[in-house]
Amino acid sequence: MQISAGNSTTRRPVDQREIPQGTVSKAVKALMDEGLLEDGEKLLRNPDGRTLSPLRLGSLYATAGVKVTHAQEQPGHVTTALFGLDTTRVLGRTDDAADSWDQVADLVYRQVTALKETEDRVRASHGLPPLRMLGVGVEVGAPVYNGQVMPPSHERSKQPVPLAEKLHRLFEADPNVSRPIPVIVENDVNALAVLAIHEIHYTDPDLVVVGVFDEGVGGGLVMDGRLRRGNNGRAMEIGHLAVAFPPGHDLGQNLDGVEAETARPSATDTVYRARCTCGQLGHVDTLATPGRIVEAFGGGILEQISEIDALDVEFKRARETFKRSGAALGRALAHVSNTVNPNRIIMYLSPSLVAAEHQPDTAGAAYLAAVRAETAGAFAASDEPDYLRIRAFPPDPEAVALLGARAAAVCVLESFIEHALRLDGCRPASRRGS
């Protein structure tokens, strides 16, 4: 088995170890007996000419991934998909509206069980056994800690939502569920970071994954090949970095020194007077998000504003809006680069902002040009051309939801791997009893 050799150049200690051939063979046999691994389709040969038996993740198991979309910090829609273990095969999908966290838990439970029942009927018609569930992953656009959806830090009166616990109880009470089903609840940008780890096959040990959403800018930090969580499990709050004021300026005051109002930003605010949802001024979220770009321009549709060209009388104003917004985001990424010094930064953006980079004569092209210029100026930024790697969100909301569901499903697989490697803090006594 090639697994046994180890890789002395890797940053992850678990990858450096040379594992005895017998141990690898026993582990593979146990995983195949359980159905988590199965034989691949055709034999391979290594450079020495030896025949290798390829393995793949087993088709007996499935993982459910759930994306919960939000509207003003309340759940609005739940998308659940059933995936094969490699998360590239979508076995089924369903969507429903939700207006409370209790309803989210009930919906997820019903959606997962319904999708599994449908797939099991298909398998039975082909003489195959029912699926086994590796787990359920839920991605939410909010801070998450130990399976709880946490309230925003500036709203201390609100209580955490024990979403994982609610789902555990629902699955445990189901007489048709013969095995415990693990439930992993994760922040949306952290889930994208875990997805990135798997998509690059652990080749870059230190990553920052950034998501630029309408609601704000978030970041997931990967160090030594593992997702790192901050205080109370929170992701990186890149959107709350102050970038629009010189050091020493009181962020509770406007530029003229008068104490700022507490109202939320509106289209009538001047650019630098827009207030962040946390109540402060000058944050990245007040400048760099698609919604704020539209507000700063004075209204409209982002795609149409982005496509304004030099023949349009609004071109100069539109270009300056995109340039200012992109520079704010790039300045934040520069701070992240100098603080964390990652191998690379992967950033998810609106497809219209990504497409504009390839249309240099349009106003929207100024956005990524400014992002790249500010990021490249960071002291610790790599000079590699793909140090900042841009990925477009899918163009339609349904595809975005499926991406989130897939990322949530990958979080289940990553949790399984970390548990097997004893990296999750689970004590041996509790492991034996699980």
Regions found by a protein language model. Give the residues of each.
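ATP-binding/phosphotransfer module of carbohydrate and carboxylate kinases, centering on a glycine-rich
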Residues: 1-132, 172-176, 201, 246, ...
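Phosphate-binding/catalytic loop of phosphoryl-transfer enzymes
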Residues: 135-139, 143-284, 291, 407-432
